Amino acid sequence: MPSNKAGIIPRLCLRSAFPSFPVSPLNERPMSSALRPSACPGLLRIVQALDGGICRIKLNGGSITAVQADIVASAAERFASGVIEATNRANLQIRGIGSTHGPLIDSLMASGLGPTTAAGDDVRNLMLSPGAGIDRTMLFDTRPLAERILDTLQGNARFHDLSAKFAVQLDGGESLAMLEHPHDLWLSAFEQDGEKRWAFGLAGCPTDTSAGSVALNDGHALVVAVLDMFLEVARPEQTRMRHLLAEHSREILLNRLAERLSIQAMTDWRRTLDSRPLHIGAHPQAEAGVVYVGAVPPLGRLDPVMLRGAAQLAARFGDGTLRFTPWQSLLLPTVRNEDAAEVIRSLERMGLFCDPDQSLTRMIACTGSSGCSKSLAETKGDALQMAALLKRHGQVLNVHLSGCSRSCAAAHIAPVTLLAVAPGHYDLYFRDAAQPGFGALHARHLTIEAVAALLDARSRSPLDA
């Protein structure tokens, strides 16, 4: 079963955590000796894989300036293989890094993309909607609160004891939101009797039943209270909220929280999921006359030319920023209506997809056996073959190819999952809420051709539910 991923949050440099303009660089890199052992890559911790080192660049709110994006592209060219990945937590990764890490790290730190302390890099994981502050249906602009949370956690060494996988989600009610990634704590804005509040839950998603609600002004206090409670109650081996809930009832934990701030019981609310592919193509923003343009790199991978080109478009036609998304894609915000078509044409010429009817926009695949020793198949290549076969059949399906059971490329359960069992062969699962893990096992040891034929036949069957 896919593991719940990521850690928690502090703040970046002496600047806004959500920049829309070039930033001042840090004067020096945090001391690497303060890094704790972890298998998770970071900006300061380069983790080795079969294809070289991996550097994970955590983006506050998924946002990066055009200047910073150009620096990332140059770093990938100069110090690595040129492979840049958009992750399912709206971050970036550089792959194929050589044995000398210092110049790459220094260039990224100087751009303002790193933490202020080495310990802070592991725990700055706060996921927002890619449409934060610009979505037409948002109830609350989450960016100021997110920046405040990042400030607090970066400045409080106590929160650096959280696992590097501990995760928080802040949902402002946007239509463009990934609501299927489990988090240790989630907050979701809603309106009740004319009052805006935060619904929240522990170890789950906003589409789950909420645990309670707090006043809109208490969002920051709630996050701090939950993290304090977790660190007080959890034993060292209990690194995630789900571990705590396996031993303590939700009611007990909520009672402890109620000692710290006013919580209203609420177990009959859950967030409605908008299943439209709003991260692809041009969509109106809250501000009249402008749109954001969403583009998907093939299987989440960009090369330096793609990233640099998108950054140049953002500087010329947008607000000078790019926003990365949990769908391993990117947005160019604040493009004038009359410029959207030209931006889309330019992105497509670079090799990005802006049409949700293209098969590769719905495909997810991990690194595969060429880059990961745990993968049993070359998932990227197999995904390209699958997309071509589905296109031939006129099918556009959400399919996840995983080289092993860890499901690194997807934090949620896809409608269709192919789990590698040997090179070019997969077990086929269909999502089923009643089944654990990837869902219901439908067939074993299938080739890509066999999977495509089966999916095509299934889509045409009148008996298919």
Model-identified regions with their sequence ranges:
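Small-residue-enriched alpha-helical segments and adjacent helix-cap loops
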Residues: N27-S33, G52-E195, S213-N217, A221, ...
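Aromatic (phenylalanine/tyrosine) cluster motif
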Residues: F18-F21
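Intrinsic, low-complexity N-terminal interaction/targeting segments
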Residues: S33-Q48, G114-T116
